[in-house]
A protein has these predicted regions:
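Active-site beta-strand/loop architecture of penicillin-binding DD-peptidases
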Residues: 1-106
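Short, gly/Ser/Thr-rich active-site loops of penicillin-recognizing serine hydrolases
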Residues: 90-142
Length: 142
């Protein structure tokens, strides 16, 4: 499970945690919702993006962290979300980081390629719903 998230060849590698004290281990999964007929297999399986929402695969990811001394575990299921590595794993990573950091996680815990996007999302969240994000910043709520 460690290699799924931390090895470049792992299906969850894009959702890894860089901070050595917070590294997680996990397993991606995809649950097929629909039947794929022999005729469809012969002509090529239709991609999730081209299917109606209710026929798309479910995305799954289970994980624990820190991997060397587990304190937290999570399971994320995104109904009709597609693949576990693209839909469920990033959500689980963010939940785990929030739990381990006790609030807003440090940007340095994310892969460098994600930091700009994550910083923008955190700022948008803070500006959109300041009363519900006070705990992200460690602020007291009145």
């Amino acid at each position: 499970m460690y290699d799924v998230v931390n090895d470049r060849r792992g299906t969850g590698y894009r959702s890894r945690i860089i901070d050595d004290t917070m590294r997680m281990a996990g397993k991606t999964g995809t649950s097929q919702v629909r039947n794929i007929t022999a005729a469809e297999r012969a002509r090529g399986v239709t991609s999730n993006a081209d299917l109606p929402w209710e026929r798309r695969d479910h995305a799954l990811f289970v994980c624990f962290a820190p991997y060397d001394k587990p304190k937290y575990a999570a399971c994320v299921l995104v109904e009709h979300g597609g693949g576990g590595s693209t839909a469920a794993a990033p959500i689980a990573r963010d939940v785990m980081l929030q739990a381990m950091a006790g609030g807003k996680p440090p940007l340095e815990a994310y892969p460098k390629s994600d930091r700009g996007r994550i910083a923008t999302q955190q700022e948008e969240l803070r500006n959109t719903t300041p009363e519900t994000t006070a705990n992200l910043e460690g602020e007291d709520q009145a």
